[in-house]
C-alpha cells in the first residue's frame, strides 16, 4: 500500500550500482530508511534527495527498509559556513537519537523550525538551544 507524508532528508549513502539508502525524518512515522532506485547517473531523481531537503515522500513497504516511489522537494535549506556545520550536527542528532519508526511529530516540527531559523540568519546559538 502506497503511503505519503512530509519528510526531511537526514542522510544519503550509495547503495549498489545506481541506488541510494536514504534516512528520512517524517512527521507520522519518525525516522525511516528507504531505497531510492535510479539515484545516481543521469537521473534527475537524485537531485531532490539530498540532506536538508524537505518535501513529500511517497513510499511502500513496512519492513525496516522501505521502497521510495518518489520524493518531491518543497524546500531545500541552503546553509553556509558555521550554520552548515550546525545544520549537519542537527541532522546527525536526529539520525542517532530518534529510534526507527518512533512517531515524534514535535521533534519533526522543531527540526524544521530550527532549520528555517538558521537559514533566515537568526542567532545560531539561540536556534540550537531552542531545538
What are these regions (language model features)?
Residues 1-131:
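Non-catalytic alpha-helical scaffolds and adjoining flexible linkers that form interface surfaces
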Amino acid at each position: 500500500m502506497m503511503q505519503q507524508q512530509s519528510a526531511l532528508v537526514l542522510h544519503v549513502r550509495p547503495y549498489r550500482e545506481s541506488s541510494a539508502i536514504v534516512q528520512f525524518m517524517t512527521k507520522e512515522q519518525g525516522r525511516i530508511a528507504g531505497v531510492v532506485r535510479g539515484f545516481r547517473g543521469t537521473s534527475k531523481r537524485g537531485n531532490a534527495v539530498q540532506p536538508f531537503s524537505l518535501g513529500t515522500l511517497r513510499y511502500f513497504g513496512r519492513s525496516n527498509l522501505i521502497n521510495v516511489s518518489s520524493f518531491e522537494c518543497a524546500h531545500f535549506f541552503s546553509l553556509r559556513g558555521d550554520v552548515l556545520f550546525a545544520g549537519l550536527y542537527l541532522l546527525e542528532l536526529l539520525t542517532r537519537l530518534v529510534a526507527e519508526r518512533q512517531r515524534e511529530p514535535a521533534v519533526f516540527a522543531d527540526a524544521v523550525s530550527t532549520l528555517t531559523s538558521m537559514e533566515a540568519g537568526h542567532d545560531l546559538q539561540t536556534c540550537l538551544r531552542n531545538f
